[in-house]
A protein has these predicted regions:
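Short beta-strand/loop motifs in extracellular/secreted proteins, especially
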Residues: 34, 45-50, 108-110
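Short edge beta-strand/loop segments characteristic of extracellular beta-sandwich folds
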Residues: 37-39
């Protein structure tokens, strides 16, 4: 199988108090997540962000919970955080998702960009 080295997503904006599935594994694909860039757009408050690797639920996207959370990050005002595990996070099953939760209560969103490889 060939690897497509790419941004796995466009820049996603995740609103306050919401969760967004930013990467979903397609049929017969393997996804390797190398980095997640998270930027806090708020100039006055730290935003807490949760990263979830959520297994599929009968072939479709599952729901994030405390059992799927792999990181919780407090991103400072107007700051950017790079989540770069030593080895890529591998998602193999159709419908597996990377979900980002913005716990913020402010009105400001965060921006998220995911990079890695897609086996095609």
């Amino acid at each position: 199988m060939a690897l497509a080295r790419t941004d796995l997503t466009p820049v996603y904006q995740v609103g306050a108090a919401s969760t967004v599935g930013v990467v979903t594994v397609g049929s017969a694909q393997t996804c390797y997540i190398k980095s997640i860039m998270i930027h806090n757009l708020d100039s006055s408050a730290t935003q807490n962000v949760d990263i979830h690797i959520v297994p599929n639920s009968s072939g479709s996207a599952g729901s994030s919970s405390s059992t799927t959370q792999i990181a919780r990050i407090g991103v400072g005002t107007d700051d950017t955080f790079f989540f770069e595990p030593a080895y890529p996070v591998v998602m193999r099953s159709n419908g597996d998702t990377l979900q980002i939760q913005n716990e913020g209560t402010a009105t400001n969103a965060i921006n998220v960009l995911v990079t890695g490889d897609l086996e095609i």
